[in-house]
């Protein structure tokens, strides 16, 4: 999955596949995780958030199925 760099203290890169509703996040500390069944509007809100890290922690982490890849 293609990812883009983001300005965040915790998240380094973010990718999204709308066909499978999968968000992929690479963290600065090295882990890569995928979050499943995430609607495209949530990805859009994440990318437009004033603080990507805060939005991710409040709205995505723990709210969608995830797996380390």
Which stretches of residues belong to each language-model region?
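A charge-rich, low-complexity, intrinsically flexible signal that marks solvent-exposed coils, linkers
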Residues: 1-34, 43-69
